[in-house]
Amino acid sequence: MKLQQLIKTHQLGLLFQQGKFGIEKESQRVDANGNIVTTAHPAVFGSRSYHPYIQTDFAESQLELITPPNEKLSDTLRWLSAIHEVTLRSLPESEYIFPLSMPAGLSPEDQIQEAQLENKWDVEYREHLSKIYGKYKQMVSGIHYNFQISDEFVEKLFSLQQTYSDPIEFRNALYMKLANNFLRYQWILVYLLAATPEVESQYFGEKSPLAAGQLVRSLRSSPYGYVNAPHIVINHDSLKDYVESLEHFVASGDLLAEKEFYSNVRLRGAKKARELLEKGVKYAEFRLFDLNPFAPYGITLEDAQFIHYFLLTMLWLEETSGQQAVEQGKAYLYQVALEDPRAPTALQTEGEAILKTTLEMLEQIQAGKEIEAIVKAKLAQFADPSKTINGRLRQAIEKAGSYKALGAQLAQQYKAQAFERFYALSAFDNMELSTQALLFDLIQKGLNVEILDENDQFLAVKFGDHLEYVKNGNMTSHDQYISPLIMENKVVTKKVLAKAGFNVPKSVEFTSVEQAVAHYPLFEGKAVVIKPKSTNYGLGITIFQQGVTNRDDFRQAIEIAFREDKEVMVEDYLVGTEYRFFVLGDETLAVLLRVPANVIGDGVKTVRELVDAKNADPLRGDGSRSPLKKIALGEIEQLQLKEQGLTPESVPTSGQIVQLRANSNISTGGDSIDMTDQMHESYKALAVGITHAMGAKVCGVDLIIPDLSQPARPNLDSWGVIEANFNPMMMMHIFPYQGKSRRLTQNVIKMLFPELP
């Protein structure tokens, strides 16, 4: 089969580049000094019997972080970033993730505990590995790179070739070619990407096989890494030969199980190798890669892209390697792994030739300038080893003082970075914060998540066979369809609540600006609220707390409201303090005092300067991707200033509170203060009743209450309902400006999956 010719003739270059990608990353949990910890796997991650993202490898201290498969490699790296951030923020304060592959700060072997898994056989298997290979070699960590050739490409290629009549046999032959050519040329990736030049002497036991001060390219990929006994040789001439030789060594007792055979390529798609002959290989797992200590998550996107196109090159090559070539590749692997990382490799000519073939392939399949630049940069590293990861690593180790010290330093640095925006997942920063918080908790607890539509905040969440859909963090099938429609229409909301016996302020509705302005005499001198009939998040609302006294100001407020809707309400202003109640089901989970947007004068700065200073708080942003919203100085704010006899250029006296908004929505720059524990229980019960009246499961209820410490009475002097909101914001409760955090996303998960342990 002439794969190159078929791709060129039938213009399959784009399809050839597609596939699915996944990454598994092993790392040790360590203390601040780089010593491997002996603590149990954190219970906050739930059970390892089902967790899809956060597992343990050999040891209880050895994390294994697993991304879901993605069609875009960039999405796989985003998931790796998110899982990493969740893990780092969930570890005890004193624990870190070691960023280097070779272990440092090893405890005596009898203190290293195999992963304590629920499946007894899994524990016994690890104990077997300890006896055969020793625990220290099992503590080596790395990256596993999973790649599935595009199914569509395989099917199209099968239809065009004439060598194979069976599609499964064809698929298996394609993956065997990929695996064997990879094993033949894997040394190239070791030269370019290896990062294990040394290890602490304790790793070797009594005597190190390396000379004092000797550096190598990759101890992990050398004979001193985790390798099987020399006599265990698996035949790669065909998949059938591969299966039979693997079964032979298991039957003879040389291997306890098929998975004990360690190879830098593992063919995946079935529990037993023999099943691959009938079912076909689904994807290949490449297990060669050292952790890149200069990448916070162990691998960069550029290197992941390079690996992808290197794998495509292994398919592109016309020759198909058999067992003899695989053995040659193993010899070259060990040779390059033990070379001095400061010197060019003895195999430079072959390495350059393969990457030049990659560049020719890129041109033929029109891969683009970006990946071409990445490959050219790698090609140049054959002539300059200092540009490789190892070249940079040697200098970094010298600067830090030791391998272990560098690892500890980077581990602390990467954990600090993960906490810089502790309220967000940096890889999914374009999603709203409530969805990011929910994603965090879903990853932490081990539920399968699929992002159906990132821009629309739509998730599919699965636990076992139980599937739920979530939009915007808390919109689910548990709410009636009619509920948000009722709450979106403020007139209907008030009528429904009034019929249910709840206190609501009087209001008048208008359908045009002129109609509303004509009724100005009815409201002159009265404290009123002007707002769109259908709104959420406080949009288009103006409040005249001291009474409206100017027709032009009234008109302007009416015009602002009409920008948000075709109908506008003018409502009596209720005296008291506004509180937001977050209700889920039959319980009020959180109560928040939202202080309207304000600044406090210092006698020096103007209002504008005070606003700029307050907006510099890192918690303030656009309000959907930050817990607090930056304060604006728009029309509504300037109207509010005018009521106080101020302008943006006024200089308030020291301690003077300047109100920039009358409404207290966080989405318009307000401050959030948790009042859950201070609020009288009677008001919490009222909020639950209001939610039930709306037919909702999740609701944000806004109540005006003059005195939160006194029990509710059945009149407007005691309390009144301002609004009921669908899809209420959760971030202001999770990350309040002041007070206790209420992790509402966890309550949403419990509502959706009550069976979750």
Give the predicted meaning of each segment.
Residues F422-E488, V492-K495, E514:
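ATP-binding N-terminal substructure of ATP-dependent carboxylate-amine bond-forming enzymes
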Residues I97-M102, A325-G329, V568-D572, Y579, ...:
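A short glycine-rich, hydrophobically flanked beta-strand micro-motif that places a catalytic Asp/Glu
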Residues Q5-H10, G105, Q116-K135, M139, ...:
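Loop-rich catalytic cores of soluble enzymes, especially ATP-dependent carboxylate-amine ligases
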Residues L641, I666-Q678, H692-A696, I705-P757:
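C-terminal active-site "lid" helix and adjoining low-complexity regulatory extension at the edge
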Residues M1-S130, K137-S141, K177:
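Terminal catalytic/cofactor-binding subdomain
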Residues E468-A632, H680-E681:
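Active-site nucleotide/adenylate-binding loops and adjacent lid/helix of ATP-dependent enzymes
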Residues G253-V265, I307-F310, M314, I560-E564, ...:
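A long amphipathic alpha-helix within ATP-dependent nucleotide-binding catalytic cores
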Residues M1-I54, G329, L333-Q444, G473:
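Sequence termini and other peripheral, non-core segments
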